[in-house]
Amino acid sequence: MSSRLPALPLSRRQALLGGAGSAAALLLPGGAQAQTRLQITEGNVAPMPIAIPNFVAGTPADNEVGLGVAQVITNNLKRSGLFAPIDQAAFIERISNIDTPPQFQSWKTINAQALVTGRMTKQGDGRLKAEFRLWDVAAGQQLTGQQYFTSPEYWRRIAHIISDQIYERLTGEKGYFDSRVVFIDETGSKERRVKRLALMDQDGANVRYLTRGADLVLTPRFSPSTQEITYMEFGQGDPRVYLFNIETGQREIVGNFPGMSFSPRFSPDGQRVIMSLQQGGNSNLFVMDLRSKSTTRLTDTPAIDTSPSYAPDGSKICFESDRGGKPQIYVMPAGGGGAQRISFGEGSYSTPVWSPRGDYIAFTKQGGGQFSIGIMKPDGSGERLLTSGYHNEGPTFAPNGRVLMFFRDPGGNGGPSLFTVDISGRNEQKVPTPGFASDPAWSPLLS
């Protein structure tokens, strides 16, 4: 295990937090026995009241980072829609020592069901030590606890990792906070719009620009390792698909095909890129092996086949095709052949993407003058629209498959913004970005 978090961008899932005992459990005697858990369904869920005091400062110099970590955790859990952080002004007990049990009655009085306590301490070697404990207030018992070591500049990532620990322990599902989003940053007027490839934390922090905006870029997608991004760029001549290495900043073209290449996406094992290639007036799906550079044709129709997305186990592909007259969603084996249409509602369907859990396919649906974001099961059943408006497009799943991010363009002289919504259709939230933003793609978990 690494001795510290790597420099930004964090792209290696195995490069976690450093030092001996970097993820050691912190359990007081009798801990981890309580059973508090939020029951998640696809209907309405009453958010769990949770108290998150500022993390205790190991030294006076650690006070600011202790406040910051608590605030990031609070914002993460609140934005999920599953938790209701209690205003700190209501707190009765002041946490000064996380090594002793809290006064549970004080937290029961303000109706907290769960309590998070923590401490941030700068070590003699310059590293930052982060500790936290999660408590079941009703049972008066500790649920879990961990400690981590890292460089001080990575305190926000510590907060995201702790948020994931809390989310998983209280919901039974994996979290999604220690992840990133690649998107298209847009600036300037609509007539002279500049589009740059950009990277940020899932909450909008730590924005980093990967391209300068000299050429138009679209549809970025993460590799499973999060080390690379594939995207389409309009440079000199036809649009091409590229690979961009986040760690080195190097890029390379994916194949040198005649005509346009677009809508790229990695296979689940990261060894192949599937894309659409234009030949004549048609566009068909091809897959390229990144090691051998060999290319295999997957579809061969007088139509436009595009926007492919693999099932998480790599066995199937969903894609968009107008072979039936207007854009619809089809599913076929990953090796090609036997495509089956799964969308049959009114309107047209585009930009399908498979959930990391394999249970849903998200899509953009156009009809009745609106663009909607929806989900359906892989066999086409259970279609449900989550949000509608003038122009909603480009859904991407969070690593746990629970939340979708998409972009919305209100029209007029403005520009697009990023939003998230739960797969139940609840809890729509705007994602902060420096300017206009479109084409989001969520990374897998970084840890």
Swiss-Prot record:
Belongs to the TolB family. GO terms for biological process: cell division; protein import. The Tol-Pal system is composed of five core proteins: the inner membrane proteins TolA, TolQ and TolR, the periplasmic protein TolB and the outer membrane protein Pal. They form a network linking the inner and outer membranes and the peptidoglycan layer. Keywords: Cell cycle, Cell division, Periplasm, Signal. It is found in: Periplasm. Part of the Tol-Pal system, which plays a role in outer membrane invagination during cell division and is important for maintaining outer membrane integrity. This is Tol-Pal system protein TolB. One of its GO terms (cellular component) is periplasmic space. InterPro entries: 6-blade_b-propeller_TolB-like (IPR011042), PD40 (IPR011659), TAT_signal (IPR006311), Tol-Pal_TolB (IPR014167), TolB_N (IPR007195). Residues 426-447 are annotated as: Disordered. Pfam families: PD40, TolB_N. It comes from Rhodopseudomonas palustris (strain BisB18). The keyword Acetylation does not apply. Its main location: periplasm. Gene3D superfamilies: TolB, C-terminal domain, TolB, N-terminal domain. The keyword Cell cycle applies. Residues 1-34 form the signal peptide. The gene is tolB.
